From Swiss-Prot:
Protein role: Peptidoglycan polymerase that is essential for cell division.
UniProt GO cellular component terms: cell division site; plasma membrane
Membrane topology designation: Multi-pass membrane protein
Keyword line: Cell cycle, Cell division, Cell inner membrane, Cell membrane, Cell shape, Cell wall biogenesis/degradation, Glycosyltransferase, Membrane, Peptidoglycan synthesis, Transferase, Transmembrane, Transmembrane helix
GO molecular function: lipid-linked peptidoglycan transporter activity; peptidoglycan glycosyltransferase activity
Full protein name: Probable peptidoglycan glycosyltransferase FtsW
Signal peptide: none
Chief place of localization: membrane
Transmembrane parts of this sequence: 25-45, 64-84, 92-112, 122-142, 161-181, 182-202, 204-224, 285-305, 325-345, 358-378
Gene: ftsW
InterPro entries: Cell_cycle_FtsW-rel_CS (IPR018365), FtsW (IPR013437), FtsW/RodA (IPR001182)
Periplasmic-side segments: 46-63, 113-121, 225-284, 346-357
EC number assigned by the record: 2.4.99.28
Topological domains, Cytoplasmic: 1-24, 85-91, 143-160, 203, 306-324, 379-402
């Protein structure tokens, strides 16, 4: 079965290419993804049963939906494996316009769905698509193409800073109109990271970081609900029943779990004490039920994905596949930063912000997009191996099954 999948991925029928198709695809990422999907489904089930019973009179409502989306996500992962990355590279400009269209569409009354004053979803038949999740992937696809095409000019101010930051600003404005400050920060960090590894001049980043801090401060000052979150973050225990309530309850979960946890399913905070226990604050539930040791193991799994993505990017650079290199770097920055923010929010290191824990938190859009993204990453690695074997069969990848 695996051999047939490899053969299908190669898109070749000659005897020589069939031999090359036997090169191992990165099974480690596949196993890690499946492991996180299963673990996430178990934790969502544990964290959501009480809330689901109260909201829908069915304790497995969120669990069933999460399992359903996980199955679809696996098919999307396989679909991404079948698409050559050159297709993204050739049409990267089109992905920018697609991103603008969906970001504008969600703001149109009757098209976008408003929940608690935020208009972030486009309802489809079986799922509400959170367009910010799609925008993260589309932004990485687009900026990878832009940087790869202008790589010799990236040391120039116009091509290296002015143009990409202007385009990023357009995306940020549309995201902030939803409003979705968290996704704006994630995309900005990914793009800035990609610009940095492209060889941009370091001194420009001081100006960029300063400008972004000033803008972030202004956004907090002019927005009462953001100021409310900052107050709760700085003084959570003084506002334990107000703006700091969610953070205090999350920290109580960490305290209850200790090093080894209270046991799977035995958490207390998910029982109406901790809001959004199955989504943004599922990390606290994990810490309460399997302990800090279990959470550290989970963090190591995420670090494996991040460093594996960086290694894939490095190999793509060595093979002069610059688009694929920046694509892989962007994916590594995305996953790494989002995990960092989610855990930071749950532990009180960062202000409360609605970002999911990749592949674990409840949410169809996040699950589907992330699995498709990992499929792209594995595809990049597979193409790297085929090209390396074509250049020199003894070059790095020697594992060919006889």
């Amino acid at each position: 079965m695996l051999y047939r999948l490899k053969l299908l991925l190669s898109g070749q029928n000659t005897k020589k290419e069939r031999v090359r198709a036997k090169l191992e695809i990165d099974i480690s990422i596949v196993f890690v993804m499946l492991g996180l999907l299963i673990f996430g489904w178990v934790m969502v089930t544990s964290a959501s049963m009480v809330v689901a019973l109260d909201d829908y009179n069915n304790p497995y409502f969120y669990s069933i939906r999460q399992g359903f989306f996980a199955v679809i996500a696996i098919f999307l992962f396989l679909l991404a494996l079948l698409v050559p990355t050159k297709n993204y590279e050739k049409n990267y400009n089109a992905f920018f316009f697609i991103m603008l269209i969906v970001l504008v569409a969600v703001l149109v009354p009757g098209v976008g769905k408003s929940v608690n004053g935020a208009r972030r979803w486009i309802p489809l038949i079986i799922i509400n698509i959170q367009v910010a999740e799609l925008a993260k992937l589309l932004a990485i696809i687009f900026f990878s193409g832009y940087i790869a095409e202008n790589l010799p000019k990236m040391t120039n101010f116009k091509e290296g800073i002015l143009t990409p930051i202007t385009l990023l600003g357009c995306i940020a404005v549309l995201l902030l109109m939803q409003p979705d400050f968290g996704s704006t920060v994630v995309i900005s960090i990914c793009v800035m990271g990609m610009l940095f590894v492209s060889g941009n001049k370091v001194r420009w980043y001081g100006l960029l970081i300063g400008a972004m801090l000033i803008m972030a401060t202004m956004l907090v000052i002019i927005s009462p609900y953001r100021m409310h979150r900052i107050t709760g973050f700085l003084h959570p225990w003084e506002n334990a029943n107000g703006s700091g309530y969610q953070l205090v309850q999350a920290l109580i979960g960490f305290g209850r779990g200790g090093w080894f946890g209270d046991g799977l399913g035995n958490g207390v905070q998910k029982q109406f004490f901790l809001p959004e226990a199955h989504t943004d604050f599922i990390t606290s539930v994990i810490a309460e039920e399997i302990g800090v040791i279990g959470l550290m193991i989970l963090l190591m799994v995420y670090l494996f994905i991040v460093f594996r993505a960086m290694n894939i990017a490095k190999m793509a650079f060595e093979l002069k596949r610059y688009y694929q290199a920046f694509l892989s770097y962007g994916i590594s920055f995305w996953i790494g930063f989002q995990v960092f923010v989610n855990i930071g929010v749950n532990t009180g290191l960062l202000p409360t912000k609605g970002l999911t824990l990749p592949l674990i938190s409840y949410g169809g859009s996040s699950l589907l997009i992330m699995c498709f993204t990992l499929g792209i990453l594995v595809r990049v690695d597979f193409e790297n191996k085929l090209l390396a074997d074509t250049i020199n069969p003894k070059y790095i990848y020697k594992k060919v099954r006889k």
